[in-house]
Amino acid sequence: MTALLKIGLVSVSDRASAGVYQDQGIPELQAWLEQALVDPFHLETRLIPDEQPVIEQTLKELVDEQGCHLVLTTGGTGPAKRDVTPDATLAVADREMPGFGEQMRQVSLHFVPTAILSRQVGVIRKESLILNLPGQPKAIKETLEGVKDKEGNVLVKGIFSAVPYCLQLINGLYIDTKPEIIESFRPKSARRENLEK
């Protein structure tokens, strides 16, 4: 499929949405996607408070009305009472993709022991993938790219290595990444050169 990739970026923060401080999640995600993706894409961005009904409605709007293939949230994934992003995400899900949350925690544990407090989830709604990411810019990049040594060799794969193939499976969209940022994985039979035969 050659449709333009549509990505929703949702920053969940009471203080940033109230203007107390500048949101850092959406700019970090946008910059990373511009570096990592080969294919052109369109962004829909939302900055919202930590309110479960608002998060649920925003996710539904991005998938159901805006037609986003991929929605990345940032913030609100911890154990505090106001951290309800995973709860809202699960509430709008058709299917859960537990491997994404497991891998995010695995990556983050290489940097901070408090990664076990994270409740990030990955889900499918209709033909879209929704992923909860951490709120801190450094942690966002680490989660997406994985753990690398000083020479840049990947020690633990980041979650985005599985995103292109997941999108291909759920909605037929084929996207590529720049291997120097994140190498996407798909079986040989699902690679473009074999699909075009």
Curated annotation (Swiss-Prot):
Keywords: ATP-binding, Molybdenum cofactor biosynthesis, Nucleotide-binding, Transferase. One of its GO terms (molecular function) is ATP binding. It is an enzyme of class 2 (transferase). Pathway: Cofactor biosynthesis; molybdopterin biosynthesis. It catalyses: molybdopterin + ATP + H(+) = adenylyl-molybdopterin + diphosphate. InterPro entries: MoaB/Mog-like_dom_sf, MoaB/Mog_dom, MoCF_biosynth_CS, MPT_Adenylyltrnsfr/MoaC-Rel. GO terms for biological process: Mo-molybdopterin cofactor biosynthetic process; molybdopterin cofactor biosynthetic process. Its EC number is 2.7.7.75. GO terms for cellular component: cytosol. Catalyzes the adenylation of molybdopterin as part of the biosynthesis of the molybdenum-cofactor. Belongs to the MoaB/Mog family. NCBIfam families: molyb_syn, PRK09417.1. PANTHER family: MOLYBDENUM COFACTOR BIOSYNTHESIS (PTHR43764), MOLYBDOPTERIN MOLYBDOTRANSFERASE (PTHR43764:SF1). This is Molybdopterin adenylyltransferase. It comes from Haemophilus influenzae (strain ATCC 51907 / DSM 11121 / KW20 / Rd).
